[in-house]
């Protein structure tokens, strides 16, 4: 009976909003602490998180809001300029739409950059910042990928030539970013090393869902972002330290097998958050909320319920 009531409450409080070309949806009871999920990109979407994790996280006592940034995913807008300021304006509108004055920000991948900059600009709107496989020192990530690539492809002369070409590109371009991540993908840097029954079932379930069918990636988004946004290859460690100094809790969780982060980068992040607010998940890569969903949800839930 309790399970039935929980399902009913989740349905009752799932509110789709399509105003101003922005797709968003809320899960859980609006009286519970709010969590806003910021997806990766540019050209990403919140489909995988929404289709696998949002509802379960909400059942732990949170009001979970997902949305796709303007010009990305289900938030189609040909006139989107893809700047951080544009995304901040839309995020502020999300707060208004759901009548939220303050929220916990849960940021994944590139969403970590956007969420960090937003928190620094609007600190009174953020209860805490949770970085999940989140970018924070972009050039260090690119350097790490390109440093390891020659050894991986040592017997592939065409690939070695491709790596050299990427290294010589302008480091503030969409082409450079794409080149680095394409190489990382070929090295299986985003892949879970040993899929479990649970993670496999989650992915199979997702691939049969409407979320998978509507998981649109806008190839124009990165091009617009690099054209219109000057902060397109930045290091946010100093900003994170300033946020922490403002007494806004910062939590970070990363996959041990997420190949786009070096050991040094993860040590730097732990130094910022503090050991108690930092966690590494074993047998886990970039998509933590699928690879090790239970551990991911437990970390987020426990930290947000016991801030400190």
Enumerate the language-model features and the residues they cover.
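Conserved hydrolase catalytic core segment
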Residues: 101-145
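Catalytic histidine-centered segment of alpha/beta-hydrolase-like enzymes
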Residues: 284-293
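Alpha/beta-hydrolase
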Residues: 163-241, 247-248
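Conserved acidic catalytic loop of the alpha/beta-hydrolase fold
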Residues: 86-103
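The serine-hydrolase catalytic nucleophile loop
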Residues: 42-54
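Conserved alpha/beta-hydrolase
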Residues: 58-74
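Flexible "cap/lid" loop of the alpha/beta hydrolase fold
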Residues: 131-172
């Amino acid at each position: 009976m309790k399970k039935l009531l929980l399902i009913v409450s989740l349905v009752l409080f799932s509110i789709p909003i399509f105003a101003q070309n922005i797709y968003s949806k809320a899960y859980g009871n609006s009286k519970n602490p709010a969590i806003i999920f910021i997806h990766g990109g540019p050209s990403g979407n919140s489909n995988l998180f929404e289709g696998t994790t949002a509802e379960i996280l909400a059942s732990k006592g949170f009001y979970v809001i997902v949305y796709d940034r303007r010009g990305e995913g289900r938030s189609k807008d040909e006139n989107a300029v893809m700047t951080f300021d544009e995304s901040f304006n839309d995020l502020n509108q999300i707060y208004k739409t759901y009548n939220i004055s303050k929220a916990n920000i849960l940021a994944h991948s590139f969403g970590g950059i956007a969420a960090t900059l937003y928190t620094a600009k609007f600190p009174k709107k953020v209860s805490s910042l949770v970085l999940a496989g989140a970018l924070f020192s972009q050039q260090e990530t690119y350097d790490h990928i390109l440093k390891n690539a020659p050894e991986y492809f040592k017997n592939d002369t065409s690939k070695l030539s491709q790596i050299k070409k990427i290294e010589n590109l302008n480091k503030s371009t969409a082409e450079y970013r794409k080149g680095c991540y394409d190489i990382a993908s070929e090295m299986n840097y985003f892949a879970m090393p040993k899929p479990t029954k649970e993670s496999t079932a989650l992915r199979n379930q997702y691939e049969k869902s409407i979320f998978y069918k509507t998981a649109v990636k806008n190839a124009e988004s990165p091009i617009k972002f690099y054209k219109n946004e000057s902060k397109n290859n930045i290091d946010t460690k100093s900003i994170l330290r300033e946020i922490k100094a403002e007494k806004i809790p910062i939590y970070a969780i990363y996959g041990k097998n997420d190949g786009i982060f070096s050991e040094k980068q993860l040590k730097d992040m732990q130094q910022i958050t503090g050991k108690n607010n930092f966690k590494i998940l074993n047998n886990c890569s970039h998509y933590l909320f699928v690879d090790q969903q239970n551990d991911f949800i437990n970390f987020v839930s426990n930290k947000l319920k016991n801030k400190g």
